[in-house]
Amino acid sequence: MARHSVQIQTAVLATVLTIGGSVVGLAQSSQTKGDTYTWNGELVSLDTTAKTITVKSRVAYQEAISELKHFKAGDRVWIVWSGMHDFSDAVRQIRRAETGGKIDENLVLPAELVSTEAPNQSLTIRVTVPENALAAIKTVKPGEWVTVTSRHRPSTQDDAVVAVRPYAATTTTE
């Protein structure tokens, strides 16, 4: 009888560990997805040597457009995106990068300001991208759109962008 009880306890423990391990695995994979967000922009240029892309994005708010005059090409900036936790389609605010500062908000991207176009409600930024992102967009031509996946609260500018891919509307298969 005691042997049977030990076998049942062992089976229950194995089941709990299996289910618990699966739940932890799911939590980790969803946490990874939750650590990033996507945004879209028009590809201006790609520099494979410097591992950077230059992208034009829309500025959503009049206050942000008014602030553009305080920045110049080459400034290190923090782009604050408008949107939900995992997606943005426009810039909400532009800030001067804090030297040695740590980004402690979601939807904030460190970048180099390339140009501003207040009348067109857009700005152009340059960001560092990982090697695999360069390969993923090598066929994208300037003027075409890309989807960029960025990390929430990146520790450095070099790890802010996780991936880049050609922008594509959702398609259905029949």
Segments from the language model and where they lie:
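Short, flexible, surface-exposed loop segments at domain boundaries
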Residues: 2-174
